[in-house]
Amino acid sequence: ELGVKLNEKASEILSEITGGKYTMLLIDEKLKMSLYTGQRKIGIEQVSRGTIEQIYFAVRMAASELLHEEECPVILDDTFVFYDDQRLENTLKWLAKYKKQVLIFTCQKREQQILEKLEIGEKNYVNEN
């Protein structure tokens, strides 16, 4: 079933982004989301805005993988505004590992600094001031 696969894939992505803090994401039939840290269930209303944004990122990436047979480019526009530096780094590592073409639009320098620190792939930067 698509719902089970979506939960599994989104959980896998979220666990990687959060450094294993959240081991499972469950989206029920009413589209209510819950997180699990170990055996403890947490409603998403109890987590930070950054974690909520990471949940949505994981769900979007999982849905994209499940719905498209071919690899699609990933286009992100100020997606990481509420991420802390560690989770941003984890997310950029995940993107580099699993995605072939990623376009990141942002008004911040953090993404560029972390990508350079990690020496991830080929990068082209356009600065508009």
What are these regions (language model features)?
Residues 1-129:
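Terminal ABC-like ATPase head and other globular end-domains that cap long coiled-coil arms
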